Amino acid sequence: MLDMNMFREHADVIRADHTKRGLPHDNIEKVIELDQAWRNLLHETDQLRRAKNEAARGIGAAKKAGDNEAAQAILNQVADLGQKIADMEAKTNEAMTVRDRLRMSIPNILHKDVPVGADESGNTAYAVHGTKPEFSFEPRTHNELIEMNKWVDLKRAAKITGSRFYFLKGDLARLEFALQQYAVDFLRQRDYTFVQPPVMMNREAYEGVTDLGDFETVMYGIEPDKYYMIATSEHPLTAMYMDETIPEEQMPMRMVGVSQCFRREVGSHGQSDLGIWRVHQFTKIEQIIIAKPEDSWALHEELLQNCTDLWDSLGIHYEVVNICTGDMGTVSYTHLRAHETKANLVCRLLLE
């Protein structure tokens, strides 16, 4: 979330970033307006406190002069001012909550190298690794492979959960575990601490790591406890140190997390691909670094290097894409820059 001083002192920078993203400026102006209203309320509250303190000083003088009636009048005035202060503090806190809730929806300022584009067609190639494999036979699709080997049971999963869930079985289930272990060990060798996070988070923690206004639509909520099933391991790993001040000498803090994740995936996927690509429950491995802002760009490159080195170690052909402004998405407003690695999935039955 952008610091409030950015809105007060560098609003033009935020407006220019919105223009780059193709977003209207309305919410920026609203945040500035709400901030001014909050500051006005804060000023009024401070004035009431000063008036209360000044009045309270007269109580002793009135009692010393033996004027009990005047002392009581001042006491009543102080009590009345105390109630006004309490009411004003409630209004001030509410104004700050409304301002900050809207401020959370304002994207971070993009890195200068992020390409400008309306959608994914504006993404640019960053790097290509390896060569596309060629075969002397016609490769089978993922659908064919899982059916002939009975590695996935979709029908029985649908009986107990609905669509886009599956039972993973046999060697394919073992392969998934093996890949998780391989990736974790790969990063542990680079001094990343292995963490298994909770798969539920409360609302307060979630609001600290993403804009729930947009992301909440793809999440599973648990009533009446106000918990959410996590949509990515990144969220609990980032929230782990909420309300804490991390000593500078402890940074950067490198972590690798593995967890089950849950999303209400929507769209046309599910017919030709048997519903195994856009699913509601899946495993994610995330690498997270908590660091000082001035070190963040170098560490972004470290994260990208880890990712490409992992793909290289598996001998898989892939490309790295520099995500453009229009493809960042509203749930990616925390991103200042983003890269995606896209592997060559030989056996996938493509929908295009």
PLM region spans:
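Short glycine/proline-enriched loop/turn "hinge" motifs that connect secondary-structure elements
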Residues: 275-281
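Hydrophobic alpha-helical segments, chiefly the membrane-spanning helices
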Residues: 346-352
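Conserved small/polar residues in nucleotide/adenosyl-binding loops
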Residues: 334-343
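Active-site loop/lid in soluble adenylation, ligation, and acyl-transfer enzymes
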Residues: 111-129, 136-268
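N-terminal alpha-helical targeting/anchoring segments
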Residues: 1-132
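Short histidine-centered catalytic/ligand-binding loop motif
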Residues: 163-173, 288-300
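Extended C-terminal subregions enriched in glycine
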Residues: 296-333
